[in-house]
């Protein structure tokens, strides 16, 4: 299949495996959830009754005082421990390499079908000015609230001029992830990035 290059009459032949495969919602959902869970720090911690600082002396005598109680560190008391206290743990989920790559291909294919995938010859700016970068984006005539630009090489000028725009994300091919692709309204790829993506996924 061929992708039209924005601002040119030329087309770019691309692999059907990457940009023309059937969309698998279940696979994409599985990979996105696993990716987000793996990014969790998992440092939540609470103190159980054995970890709370306080005396373990019986608070009152056994008989004649109503409900029977022991230590004041029990979860029922204010200042006591937490029942079933949370402990630090890993939320990471294993995803097979084939699954991950298939999900990325599936996302690219669906973006292409929906007209949310654009290809440009190159995307670079000569000066580190946000205004110049914004004008370049405007010339692409993309419609959407969030824009992801994937380039084979990111110059210092491109990085500096784009970082002040809240709804624009500039990444290299190596920094691509399924969450960034799914969360973007429009994805712009350079020709060099397309070739690197095909080398990675095919």
UniProtKB/Swiss-Prot annotation:
GO terms for molecular function: rRNA binding; structural constituent of ribosome. GO terms for biological process: translation. GO terms for cellular component: ribonucleoprotein complex; ribosome. Residues 42-52 have a biased composition (Polar residues). It comes from the Bacteria. Residues 42-70 are annotated as: Disordered. Keywords: Ribonucleoprotein, Ribosomal protein, RNA-binding, rRNA-binding. Belongs to the universal ribosomal protein uL4 family. Part of the 50S ribosomal subunit. One of the primary rRNA binding proteins, this protein initially binds near the 5'-end of the 23S rRNA. It is important during the early stages of 50S assembly. It makes multiple contacts with different domains of the 23S rRNA in the assembled 50S subunit and ribosome. This is Large ribosomal subunit protein uL4. It comes from Xylella fastidiosa (strain Temecula1 / ATCC 700964). The gene is rplD.
């Amino acid at each position: 299949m061929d992708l039209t290059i924005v601002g040119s009459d030329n087309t770019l032949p691309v692999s059907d495996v990457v940009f023309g495969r059937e969309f698998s919602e279940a696979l994409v959902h599985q990979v996105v959830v696993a990716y987000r869970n793996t990014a969790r720090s998992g440092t939540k911690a609470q103190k159980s009754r054995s970890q709370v600082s306080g005396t373990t002396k019986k608070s009152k005598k056994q008989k004649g005082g109503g409900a029977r109680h022991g230590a004041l560190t029990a979860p029922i008391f204010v200042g006591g421990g937490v029942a079933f206290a949370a402990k630090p743990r890993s939320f990471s989920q294993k995803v097979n390499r084939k699954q991950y790559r298939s999900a990325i291909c599936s996302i690219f294919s669906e973006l292409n079908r929906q007209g949310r995938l654009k290809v440009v010859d190159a995307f670079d700016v000569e000066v580190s000015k946000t205004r110049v970068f914004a004008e370049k984006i405007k010339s692409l005539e993309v419609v959407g609230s969030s824009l992801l630009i994937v380039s084979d090489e990111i110059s210092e000028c491109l990085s500096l001029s784009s970082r002040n725009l809240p709804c624009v994300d500039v990444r290299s091919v190596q920094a691509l992830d399924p969450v960034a692709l799914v969360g973007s309204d429009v994805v712009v790829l350079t020709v060099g990035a397309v070739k690197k993506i095909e080398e990675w996924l095919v």
